[in-house]
Amino acid sequence: MPSSSPQQPLIRSRDAALDLIKWLALLTMLIDHLRHAWPALYFLYVPGRLAFPLFCLAIAANVARPTVGNAGGLSVRYLGWLLLFSLISEWPYRLLVSNAESLNVMPTLVLGLLIANAAQRSDIQVRWLGAGALAVAVLAHEWLMFGAFGALLPAAFLLALRGPRALWLLPMVCCLAANYWAPFYVDAARGDPFAWSVLGMCLFAPLLGLLLLRLRPPFAVPPVRRWAYLFYPAHFLVLAALRSL
């Protein structure tokens, strides 16, 4: 992604704004999952809608970063970590969410990374790999957390990063579709404030992330490194243990 474009945020080798987005994603994910340990905290579902789109934005920013990978796109090591923790995280995820109807979020992020990378690069092999990931996302829609639209969200963010601000609508609409659940729309039609809060947060989350990525935080932001991969399955285990006390 050319750093000279006035329509695109500058993605540096160690971007404090990107680290801030990752911290916010981790924090809101933890806040969201507290409701699985303590059901009375169900209202935390609303701020929890921030987490997934922020993770997807982080993926898009990494794909867009010119120094990632051999040709400015997919890092095999990055993909490998996501694949590894997709497997590691499934049992802790189901330990906390025993009635889960989907896989943990990591497989969706893996597919999203492959699709976004195909949108970034012109290599025929990469394009075929992205097409295969898209086909898997469509076929496995019912088993993926956030479904096929969730797998498309990193690519939608990538287009928003590369294009004019009018394209910011793409990740906003995609995020809303990824969080689609018919009862919310029924409740929203009845004027239920909780349902409207959820739908509003789904539209707000991508906008917040894109705005944050363009800012330079006036304070030091600790880098988010590989420990974050371990945090995902570990926080499931900790919450499951706390629930059993």
Stretch-by-stretch model annotation:
Residues 1-245:
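Alpha-helical transmembrane segments and their immediate juxtamembrane cytosolic regions
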